[in-house]
Amino acid sequence: MIRRLQDSGDLVRAFPRVHFVGIGGTGMSGIAEVMLTLGYEVSGSDNADNAATRRLAKLGARVMRGHSAANVLGTDCVVVSSAIREDNPELMEARSQRIPIMPRAAMLAELMRFRRGIAVAGTHGKTTTTSLAAAVLSEGGLDPTFVIGGQLLAAGANAKLGGGQWLVAEADESDGSFLRLNPLMAVITNIDADHLENYGNDFARVQAAFAEFLQRLPFYGLALLCIDDPEVAALAGKTPRHVMSYGMSENADVRAEDVVQDGPCMRFTLRLPEGTTTPVTLALPGRHNVLNALAAAAIGWQLGVAPDTIARALENFAGIGRRFNDLGEVTTSTGARVRVVDDYGHHPRELEAVFAAARGGWPDKRLVVAFQPHRYSRTRDQFDAFAAVLSTVDALVLSEVYPAGEAPIPGADSRALARAIRARGRSEPVVVGQIAGLAEVLPDVLQDGDLLLMMGAGDIGYVAQHIINNGFVGEPA
């Protein structure tokens, strides 16, 4: 049947049924929630049940476990995660039925088309920066729509349909999909060598992709660039778009001065264009989070949020799931009382920043790290950097690599990494073959008063939560 848009009145009524293949992913679930709120009939499938799928089901989405051709019958559009293989039965059925298939980033671009878009890109810090920006704009009364790659703890969700005209979202460079977006403002936090397998193992192509991302801005758009990062600073002088810089450099348009760490918080003076200064207490640890906060402050300033309102939003920020998430204290079977922090960091540069934040906030505690490497290709490409940064902690437990769909690569596993760390002569790492056994090994390593960092982008977060709920016994469900 041929549908007439003028008969339905709007696109939701014309094409009401949208199906998400891989709906439980962080990027997918956020878009699905926004579309549910817009009035679409949302369905989706995923191989795993998680907090995101359960939340969507409660909101009214029809969520199926596993993938089947029958799942897409009757749908008007299929949205697909970049993690889904081309031979997925739902994609094959959609093609045979000539149902439109849209990559996740393309659907995000469609949502952004009906709002004024702010896209946050960068190898590290996207989720925190996007979350802080959403908090600043919300505090400023702008009621933004946001789509974030992690749970904003104050909202209990990673997405929200706001009543205002602005949409702030992460722009994912990992597979180049951020080049589908056409924002009005573009933030670049930093540029690093990661996900090189998607760029022909050529860092120059990564650099070129970020340059092209800025070219997606309209001529009246704005690039917000962290000039503390050398790669981003190099872009600042080349892009033919309006640029506003931020950082701790004296040359930054928006900068932080007199930065000090006070336990889990950072204190600094926020200097805005035209010389306005405001004291800020940021409710996140680490100098890297100060940079993330500066990006959010720059966005707020551009949109007319008052400096004291920006400062209040940063001070009241409740955090994001798995970003230096302080889960509290727990007692081991040997009687040691330890503090547990859960973090998503999985790149050497991220580990270095988190370790610095931990030592700055708790300088008298031993730093014990349980780390689950993520992807064999990243472990191979960043092998020496991983060995160097992991050698700096007081005690280390390594689980096997979380493959994320990759086949094992010889010499890029946790045992090889442990040997390289051991050869540096600074620590004696413990290797656990399966992540499920991690909790029972940790009491042999921990001492009273330790700070335990549970780090990685795989499923180690479930172990951290299991330890808080059940102690160091049993396996996470």
From Swiss-Prot:
Top-rank taxon, per record: Bacteria
GO biological process: cell division; cell wall organization; peptidoglycan biosynthetic process; regulation of cell shape
UniProt xrefs under InterPro entries: Mur-like_cat_sf (IPR036565), Mur_ligase_C (IPR004101), Mur_ligase_C_dom_sf (IPR036615), Mur_ligase_cen (IPR013221), Mur_ligase_N (IPR000713), MurCDEF_pg_biosynth (IPR050061), UDP-N-AcMur_Ala_ligase_MurC (IPR005758)
EC number(s) reported in the record: 6.3.2.8
Family: Belongs to the MurCDEF family.
Places the protein is found: Cytoplasm
Entry protein name: UDP-N-acetylmuramate--L-alanine ligase
GO-annotated cellular components: cytoplasm
Amino-acid positions noted as binding ATP in the UniProt annotation, renumbered to this chain: G122, T123, H124, G125, K126, T127, T128
Flavoprotein listed as a keyword: no
Chief location of this protein within or outside the cell: cytoplasm
HAMAP family per record: MurC
Function text: Cell wall formation.
GO molecular function terms noted in the UniProt entry: ATP binding; UDP-N-acetylmuramate-L-alanine ligase activity
Pathway(s) it belongs to: Cell wall biogenesis; peptidoglycan biosynthesis
One Pfam family matching this protein: Mur_ligase_M
Catalytically driven reaction(s): UDP-N-acetyl-alpha-D-muramate + L-alanine + ATP = UDP-N-acetyl-alpha-D-muramoyl-L-alanine + ADP + phosphate + H(+)
Gene: murC
Keywords: ATP-binding, Cell cycle, Cell division, Cell shape, Cell wall biogenesis/degradation, Cytoplasm, Ligase, Nucleotide-binding, Peptidoglycan synthesis
